[in-house]
A protein has these predicted regions:
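Non-transmembrane, aqueous-exposed alpha-helical and coiled segments at domain scale
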Residues: 1-52, 61-215
Length: 215
């Protein structure tokens, strides 16, 4: 029996976040998952990142909506999508976002899986690109059809409550007491909850546009 998120110390709302189900041909080929089907949950990206924040939640939702736009009612194919990050890997939170995108899509940079055998089957290497000419946070392109989209994100539509600003200032300066730190953490996760539960399908938070990348 699978433990619920709160049983592992996670906030209960993590289980309310949308899930992302894909088929991974490599997982099927190697017998890692029945029919290659893998379902990702928000808890997976929290484990990957080691934390939960608006950026991690936004990256998860961008991957979700990007794949929905590319595949429609089809099940997305992990490892068959290229991801194009607008900024350099060391710029701001680009590294955090790209890590989440890599987990979900399988697209990797130069350290990715080079492929199986002489035919390099199921290769994921160099499917993740930085510094791309993208009008959005990131772009995604199907390798089989060439269909491409850009994905945009604006977390300003889910603002911090007024109470948070002084708490954040004290917490980041390592000057908050235990009660203030507890409240800070509650408000921090409440914003994440709003994004994942109340705004998950709100096009003001995450929206997708068709894209025609340069050859």
């Amino acid at each position: 029996m699978t433990a619920e998120p709160q049983d592992q110390g996670f906030p209960a709302f993590y289980s309310e976040a949308p899930t992302i189900k894909l088929r991974d041909p490599l997982a099927q080929f190697l017998g890692a998952a029945r029919h290659g089907v893998i379902e990702y949950r928000y808890t997976d990206v929290v484990r990957l990142s080691g934390h939960s924040c608006p950026t991690v939640a936004g990256a998860y939702l961008m991957a979700l909506h990007g794949l929905r736009a590319l595949y429609g009612t089809e099940m997305p194919v992990r490892g068959d999508v290229e991801v194009f990050m607008r900024d350099a890997p060391g710029s701001g939170v680009t590294g955090v976002i790209s890590s989440v995108a890599q987990l979900v899509t399988g697209a990797a940079g130069e350290t990715g899986f080079p492929g199986a055998g002489q035919l390099a089957l199921f290769a994921r290497k160099n499917l993740l690109v930085f510094g791309a000419d993208v009008d959005g946070v990131l772009g995604m392109r199907r390798r089989d059809t060439g269909k491409a989209v850009t994905v945009h994100f604006d977390n300003a539509v889910v603002p911090w409550p007024g109470e948070m600003r002084p708490l954040m200032t004290k917490a980041f300066a390592d000057q908050a007491n235990s009660a203030e730190l507890e409240r800070f953490a509650q408000l921090w996760q409440e914003r994440v909850r709003s994004m994942l539960v109340e705004y998950a399908d709100n096009p003001a938070l995450v929206w997708v546009s068709d894209w025609q990348p340069a050859p």
